[in-house]
Amino acid sequence: MKKLLLLSALLIISIFGYTQTAITNANIQTAVDLWDSDLSAATTTYGNISDWDVSQVTDMSQLFYHNPDFNYDIRNWDVSNVTDMRQMFYEASSFNQPIGNWDVSSVTDMSYMFYYATSLNQDISNWDVGNVTDMVNMFGNAESFNQPIGNWDVSSVTAMGGMFYYTSAFNQPIGDWNVSSVTYMGGMFYAAESFNQPIGNWDVSSVTDMGYMFSYATSLNQDISNWDVGNVTDMVNMFNTASAFNQPIGNWNVSGVANMYAMFYYASTFNQPIGNWDVSGVNDMSWMFHNAGNFVQDISNWCVSNITSEPTGFSNGTQNFPENYKPIWGTCPPLGIDDQNLTNISIYPNPTDNTLFIIGNKTPIAFSIYNVLGKEVLCIKNTNNINVQALPSGVYVIKISDGVRQTNIRFIKN
C-alpha cells in the first residue's frame, strides 16, 4: 500500500511538475534575481513570473532596481497588500507592461517608482493612490510617459519634488489635483519641456520649497498669479530657463523667502512688475536676473538690507535693465505715510553730472541724499535744484519729505 502511494505521488509530480515555493517578503527579491539569471531554475522553483501569487507581499521597494532588460507581463499580480513601491522600477528602462488594473490602494510610498523607466507609457489613470504620501521623483526621467492621471486623488501626498523631473513627453491636465497637503515641490517640473497645463487653481499654501520647480520647463506659460506662496522659503532657480514664462506674479507674498538665487536665470521672456515684493528676508539674489533679456522693471524700492552689495551676476546679460531700477544694496527704503500723494514729484536729469532739478513740489520740502550704504551724504531744504557735483560717481537715493509724507527716488551721479 505504501509503495502504491509513493508511486502515485511521483506520478503526480511527473505530470504537474515540482511543488513551487510561495512568494513572500522574505524571498521575492531572490525570486526576481533568479528569474533574471536563470529563467529555467526560477520557473521550476517559483513558476512563471506572470502567475506568481504575491498577495502576501507588502514590500516591493527596489524590486526591479537597475534591471534594464526586465519587461515581463505582471499585470495579474495581486499587489493589494503592498505598502511600499519606492524605486520599484528604478532604471527598469525596458519595462512597458499594462499594470493599470493593479490595486495599489494600500501603497503609501511611490517615490522614484518609475525613475529612469524610459520606455514606460501605460495607462494607470484608474490607480487608487489615495494613501500615497510620497511621490518624489515618481516619474523622474520617465521620458516616454504621457498618460492621463488628472483624476488621481493625491490629497494625502506631502512630497512631489521632482515628480516630473525630465519627464519630457508629459503634458496632461492635472489642474484639479488637491495638493493642499504638499510641502515639497522642489524640481517638480524640472525639464518637463512639454508641460503647459493650467495649474493656477492649486492650493499651494502648505508648500515651503519651490526651488527649481519650473527650471527648464520651456513650454510653461500658465497663470499662477493666485498662488498663495506665503509659506515658501526657497525659490532657488524656480524659473531658471523657463523661457516661455511671462505671467503676472507681482502680488505674490514672498515675505518668507530666504533664497532667490538664479530665480529668473535665462527666463528670457519674463517681464512682469514685481517691484512691490517684500524681499526683506532674502539673503541670496546671486544670478537672479542673469540673461533675463526682456526684464525691465523698477525694483529700486526693494528692501535688501540683508544683501550689502550687488550679488554676483545679479543682472549680467540683461542689457536693457537700467541701473536706477536696481535696489540700493544694504538698505531698506523707508515707507512714507500716504506716499502716493508725493508721486507727482520727479527729478531730472537722471543720471546727472552736476545738478538735480526737482519738479512738482508746491509746499516746503526737505531733501536728504543717501549713498548705497544708507549713509546720509547731503541734506538741503526749500529749493528746486540740488548741486551734487561734489558727490562721487555712483548710485544714490534722494528722500523727499514735506514733514508728513515722503517718497524715495533713486538717481545716478556720473
Features from the language model and the residues they span:
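Bacterial Sec-dependent N-terminal signal peptides
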Residues: 1-20, 379, 397
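Intrinsic-disorder/low-complexity peptide segments enriched for small residues
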Residues: 2-9, 83, 118, 218, ...
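Alpha-helix initiation and N-capping motif
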Residues: 3, 25-28, 350
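Negatively charged
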Residues: 18-335
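C-terminal outer-membrane/trafficking sorting elements
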Residues: 340-414
